[in-house]
């Protein structure tokens, strides 16, 4: 066994740089608000958008990227080929590194078609997609879309800054967007979903910063009556970079239609 008494403590620097900084110059940086999709046929797809950020003035989610790609995650954990499912302006199958999803297997093509037919899933592409993209139902600059279904079938939608809206037609159109009363939140994602007992929860940063992380509960998905702490710590920032914020933030759950795990 190792003798830890002889080990010398060597503190690591607070800021560490990932391997990407040691590689050759790259053409794109991955950005995604949504990373997974489970098809009706049981196909698991990983997805992300290739953005371009060459300088501090660039954002990987400014609508000026290359496009969104998908690849199958197989049951043994191996990965299938990469395919483009969406192209930003100026890009197509002829000037990109991977083929279009129409050249994938029948099962993967069907899964991609499900995504393209799902307005609630496409809404999560709004930041990376072209500005004014017709595929996006609400293309007005709001960020970090999230939604869940109410008992009466309406879709309750959430964005950053506690912006909320309702959809009466499954996500194709939405009511006027308003800021939720009493919902303290600034520039960070809010995640909301229906729980296994039929109640609802939102997980977010109830402050003007990206800490602490809290959870609020609701019986009907519209009126939230509790607020409890999940994490109040602000760990040191290990990696430097542009648009980095401290604190526990950008929580996601499992979106509707992608399965419901058993309660522990």
Task: Locate the predicted segments by residue.
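Asp-box/BNR beta-propeller blade signature and adjacent active/binding-site loops
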Residues: 1-264
